[in-house]
Structures are given as C-alpha cells and as structure tokens.
C-alpha cells in the first residue's frame, strides 16, 4: 500500500480564493467587535454555516453572509491583516503561489475610492508576499449582477495596474443572472492589456455556461467548471485546449451543487485530461482551506499520491506565476513524490 504523504508539504498553486472569503473566522469576530457590527448568527456559531445556493433564496442568504463579513473590512489595516493572514494560511497548506480574487468596488467607498482601494490591496499583497515568502498576485473580478459598463471600467483599471501585480480578470457572483456575452467587451479590454481571462462558469448552471465563457469571453481558465463533466464534447474541448478549471470541491458540496464530496466529478475531469487547480473558494463560509481540497481528492476519489502530485503540477502550470517560480514549484512537487 502506498505511503500517504503529508499534503500540506505538497507544493501547489492556489488560483481560486476570494478576498473576503479568505478571512479567518477569528479575525471576522475581532473586526466585528471593533466596529460594533452585529453579525448573523450563522457567522458566529463556530462552525461553517449551512448553505444551499441552488435556488435564488439560497444564493441570497449566501450573499447576505458574505456582505456582512465584508462590512467589517473598513480600514487599510484591516485589508493588510486579511491579506497577510490569507498568505500565512496558504503557506501552512503548502501553497507557493496565490492568486487572490477581489472586486475593489466593494471596498472603494470606505477606502477613499476605487484607485486608493486597488493600491491598498496591491501594497498589502506586496507586503504579505515579502513577509511570508509566498508568491502572490491579484485577479480583479467584475460582478455579473452589475452593469457591463462597470465591468469595462474595472477591466481598464486592472490593465492600468498590470505592472503592479494584477494578472487576470474574472467574472463572479450568481452565474444564473445575466449573460456572459454582455461582458465580452470588458474581457476584450483585459485580454488586450495582457491579462488572463478567468470567469466563473459551470457551477450553479450546466455545461452551457462553460461554453459561454469559452465562446464569448475567450477564457483561459474557468472558475469552477465542474458542470462540464456533463458534456463529453465540452470535456474534450477543454482538454484539447488545456483550459484549467479551478475546481473547489468543498464549496461545491456546501452550496448544494453536489450532495456529497464523492459526487464532485474530479475523476471525470482528470481522466478526460482537463487540467484542474483545486481551490478553497471562500474558507470563511465553507470551513476548509487549500490542503483540504487535496484531501477530498485522496479520501473520496482515491487519488494516489502520484495523481495528487499531477493535480499540483496542473495548478502550477495553470497559474500566472513566472517561469522560474513555476520551475521551483514543479521541482518541489517531484521531490515531494520521490523524497
């Protein structure tokens, strides 16, 4: 029987982590106390809230909890603390590269405007990277619940700061709302500015939303993408083009996309040759971080250490990390497997 190696020592890249959702529960409680914010009971119970976002009511509840947590981030020091702690958690889980996703419009009103908010976030990322040794970059994400013109503004802003650590442009929130093609111009602006396109798709809706991300937004990565498993032709397309899917198993179960961890189609994607980068999504709400996603692959899908190492390689290759960083992480993965 193969020896089960420590998954926290497996070098990996983390490509799907939302900004507010990365917060430690203890930090949320401290910030809520600092600002006198009364949090919903679901955020103070000491265990992950029970969520099911497969209908609009469930998604509204999820969003309400997220907004409550975000309301506790009010000052630059709060931003710096969140980013530093996210980096510390990732390092603890074996990550050597983190691309954290943020919609700065959510923080701009309290941080002096959009540009100050972006600069505070980027400065926090630089500081956290220096302090922890973790390679870190930022994806700016538009909100599909807002007007496409807002997304274009964000895309231009993201391109403006591409030399300061912004590497990609995303599209998040309830994929059942709006059409991907409404945001095609924003993604064109981002791509023309050298940013990778990483919209959400194939989570709450089926394979069609993944196709829309490919056809309308020319995605180079897909946030989630698991529902592509329902369409063999789409799987082949993803595999042929080596489009990385940022798969978040614990999140998929918590939000009701799948009933059990073993129902998440990790094997289907893996055996079809679709690259995956396992991600934690929103640890604050789902109760698990990066290494736990690899543990799900091991425990519920019988991934061997050789296969887990390949998953880690796929996460690195799908990242925006520079070549030298990728080479170092890939060598570390080989050492984890053979050492």
Curated annotation (Swiss-Prot):
Its EC number is 3.5.4.-. Binds 1 zinc ion per subunit. GO terms for biological process: nucleotide metabolic process; purine ribonucleoside monophosphate biosynthetic process. Keywords: Hydrolase, Metal-binding, Nucleotide metabolism, Zinc. The active site is at 203 (proton donor). Zn(2+) binds at residues 16, 18, 200, 281. InterPro entries: A/AMP_deam_AS, A_deaminase_dom, Ado/ade_deaminase, Metal_Hydrolase. The record marks 224 as: Important for catalytic activity. GO terms for molecular function: deaminase activity; hydrolase activity, acting on carbon-nitrogen (but not peptide) bonds, in cyclic amidines; metal ion binding. PROSITE patterns: A_DEAMINASE. Its cofactor is Zn(2+). PANTHER family: ADENINE DEAMINASE. NCBIfam families: aden_deam, PRK09358.1-5. This is Putative adenosine/adenine deaminase. It comes from Streptomyces virginiae. The lineage of its organism: Bacteria, Bacillati, Actinomycetota, Actinomycetes, Kitasatosporales.
């Amino acid at each position: 029987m193969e020896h089960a190696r420590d998954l926290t020592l497996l070098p990996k890249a983390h490509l799907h982590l939302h900004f507010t959702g990365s917060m430690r529960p203890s930090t949320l409680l401290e910030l809520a106390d600092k600002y006198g914010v009364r949090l919903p009971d679901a955020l103070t119970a000491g265990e992950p809230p029970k969520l099911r976002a497969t209908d609009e009511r469930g998604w509204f509840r999820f969003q309400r909890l997220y907004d409550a947590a975000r309301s506790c981030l009010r000052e630059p020091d709060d931003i710096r603390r969140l980013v530093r702690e996210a980096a510390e958690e990732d390092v603890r889980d074996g990550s050597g590269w983190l691309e954290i996703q943020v919609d700065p419009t959510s923080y701009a009103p309290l941080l002096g405007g959009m540009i100050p908010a972006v600069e505070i976030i980027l400065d926090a990322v630089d500081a956290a990277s220096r302090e922890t040794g973790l390679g870190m970059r930022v994806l700016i994400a538009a909100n599909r619940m807002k007007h496409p013109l807002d997304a274009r503004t964000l895309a231009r802003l993201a391109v403006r700061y591409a030399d300061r650590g912004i590497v990609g442009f995303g599209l998040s929130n309830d994929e059942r709302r709006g059409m991907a093609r409404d945001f095609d111009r924003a993604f064109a602006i981002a791509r023309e500015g050298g940013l990778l396109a990483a919209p959400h798709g194939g989570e709450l809706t089926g394979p069609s939303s993944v196709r829309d991300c490919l056809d309308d937004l020319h995605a180079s990565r897909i946030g989630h993408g698991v529902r592509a498993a329902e369409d063999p032709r789409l799987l082949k397309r993803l595999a042929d083009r080596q489009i990385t899917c940022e798969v978040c198993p614990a999140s998929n179960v918590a939000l009701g996309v799948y009933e059990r961890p073993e129902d998440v189609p990790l094997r289907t994607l893996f055996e079809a040759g679709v690259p995956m980068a396992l991600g934690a999504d929103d640890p604050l709400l789902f109760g698990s971080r990066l290494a736990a996603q690899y543990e799900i692959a091991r425990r519920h899908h019988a991934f061997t250490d050789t296969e887990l190492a390949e998953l880690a390689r796929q996460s690195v290759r799908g990242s925006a990390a520079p070549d030298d960083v990728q080479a170092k992480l890939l060598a570390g993965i080989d050492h984890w497997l053979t050492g």
